[in-house]
């Protein structure tokens, strides 16, 4: 599933707004110990973002790459922009940036994902963040996770993933190191006790 499919969806799917939590036996390095926020799920596939993988880039790096600022301008960025988190969202279109954010900011390019969270992938939101006028809560993700028709369902059926309702606090929390364990805790699961062969919720 792609961003264009997300834009054109008419109803929410079964896994929309859910967390996928990788089982310990996940062999794909892209997804080992990941927590993924599912933005769209339908018969055509699914799309979501890894929310617990850091990126070796800063928001200043992104602005410089996009020619939005010059080197000398970086020192006058508002604190919210200097400290803005950049994360790895997944292996698909890994050079493309997406901003997952609270719904206090909406533009023509914003796509509602849930009642409180939207997704924007335009330069307008990047400019707004650089000026300190962006959403109150947000993170930029490079790339996304995508599945074709029936693929995610098959992976869940073979115990590749656990799923549970998403938690907004966890989505935007900037502490990534223990986010996997905290996502499991939402389900009452201790990561140390989780078997690679456990069933799914």
Swiss-Prot record:
Pfam families: DUF179
UniProt superkingdom: Bacteria
GO cellular component term, pick one: cytosol
Family label: Belongs to the UPF0301 (AlgH) family.
HAMAP family with a match to the protein in the record: UPF0301 (MF_00758)
PANTHER family: UNCHARACTERIZED PROTEIN YQGE, UPF0301 PROTEIN YQGE
Protein name per UniProt: UPF0301 protein Arad_1256
